[in-house]
Amino acid sequence: MIGFGWLEALLRVGRKLFVKPETQLYPEQKPKLYPRARGRIVLTRDPDGQERCVACNLCATVCPVGCIDLAKAVADDGRWYPEYFRVNFARCIFCGFCEDACPTAAIQLTPDYELSEWRRDALVYEKHDLLISGEGKVRGYRYWSVAGKAIPGKDKGEAEHEAPPVNLKGLLP
């Protein structure tokens, strides 16, 4: 017994021949990006032009694939800054956890998603590649004016409404 399924398939293909294709030609037609699209990681500066990053290492800790590497250094005024800051975009999954974990809004994700390179080692970005001249998405935030600096002449426990630190060795028998 011969069915007519082949005729139905032929008619279906014939109808699709005259319909506009849904495929977008990528380099000529860019896809629509949504406002919260996550792309390349950048390091921002505060309004004074200083680096916002305090090298707290929260971004590297929260990263699920471990693509962020940094080392802390201390400036003459006691301010922490990253001696080096390295992001391996070959491993990055652009989850945005690093942006959420950053207490100073220093690390931000931009909508730049075109990161293709011929060599894999070219996808390892150093601090000078990541640092931008502007403030990014968070404008006017000065972390160092509200936190992070030692008060001259006041040690721990000497500020107003602050209890002195507990001596743990004094609690031992």
Curated annotation (Swiss-Prot):
- Superkingdom as given in the UniProt entry: Bacteria
**The protein's Enzyme Commission number:** 7.1.1.-
Q: Where is the composition biased (Basic and acidic residues)?
A: 153-163
Bilayer topology: Peripheral membrane protein
GO terms (molecular function) for this protein are: 4 iron, 4 sulfur cluster binding; iron ion binding; NADH:ubiquinone reductase (non-electrogenic) activity; quinone binding
Q: What chemistry does it catalyse, as a reaction equation? A: a quinone + NADH + 5 H(+)(in) = a quinol + NAD(+) + 4 H(+)(out)
InterPro entries tied to this protein: 4Fe4S_Fe-S-bd, 4Fe4S_Fe_S_CS, NADH_quinone_OxRdtase_chainI
Q: Which residues form a coiled coil?
A: none
Positions bound to [4Fe-4S] cluster 1: C53, C56, C59, C102
Sorted alphabetically, the keyword list is: 4Fe-4S, Cell inner membrane, Cell membrane, Iron, Iron-sulfur, Membrane, Metal-binding, NAD, Quinone, Repeat, Translocase, Ubiquinone
Q: Which cofactor does it need?
A: [4Fe-4S] cluster
Protein residues bound to [4Fe-4S] cluster 2: C63, C92, C95, C98
Q: Which SUPFAM superfamilies match?
A: 4Fe-4S ferredoxins
> What range(s) does the 4Fe-4S ferredoxin-type domain occupy?
41-73, 83-112
Q: Does the keyword Cell membrane apply?
A: yes
Q: Which GO terms describe its cellular component?
A: plasma membrane
Q: How is the cofactor bound?
A: Binds 2 [4Fe-4S] clusters per subunit.
Localization, per the record, is:
Cell inner membrane
The function of this protein is: NDH-1 shuttles electrons from NADH, via FMN and iron-sulfur (Fe-S) centers, to quinones in the respiratory chain. The immediate electron acceptor for the enzyme in this species is believed to be ubiquinone. Couples the redox reaction to proton translocation (for every two electrons transferred, four hydrogen ions are translocated across the cytoplasmic membrane), and thus conserves the redox energy in a proton gradient.
Subunit structure and binding partners: NDH-1 is composed of 14 different subunits. Subunits NuoA, H, J, K, L, M, N constitute the membrane sector of the complex.
Instruction: Report the protein name in the record.
Output: NADH-quinone oxidoreductase subunit I 2
* Annotated source species: Rhodopseudomonas palustris (strain ATCC BAA-98 / CGA009)
This protein's gene is called: nuoI2
